[in-house]
């Protein structure tokens, strides 16, 4: 049995988790998973189907998600991110997506996962845990660059406002709030 090495990368939205996680994974030859894309994929299904949002339907969607579903650039859109953050407050949906996340490293020598609760909930025994922080202004500029790449115009002020709202929601949700665990770097 392969016992994969798990590296957890947690942090705020647009803090650089994905960039850092991908660099580490590429350097080590490990697989990489942006776990936020799982929630965004569920949100995207609701947005594109224009169906009423329910947790039962979200769980049904989550059960059908495959890795290839996470390659869609539309998952990076603001609407997907905001709805994903709200859906992530559901304990039932989180439990379903935890299954996907915990199975991801199977049959691999190692995996890097980034998100909000990788080191605290998904893999509390991860070999290495990082918690990434960046100033709000830097994060807003990073997010603005992401938006520009997909043809979306925003003001830095508006992006900062949205990031603050997202930070508050992520840090204060009852289930798996964003926090820096004591053994994170």
Model-flagged regions — what are they?
Residues 111, 127-131, 184-185:
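Short, well-ordered beta-strand core segments
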Residues 37-110, 117-120, 137-141, 145-149, ...:
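ATP-dependent small-molecule kinase phosphotransfer cores
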Residues 14:
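Walker A (P-loop) phosphate-binding loop of P-loop NTPases
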Residues 18:
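Walker A/P-loop
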Residues 7-9:
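Hydrophobic anchor at the beta1->P-loop junction of P-loop NTPases
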Residues 1-4:
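Phosphate-binding P-loop
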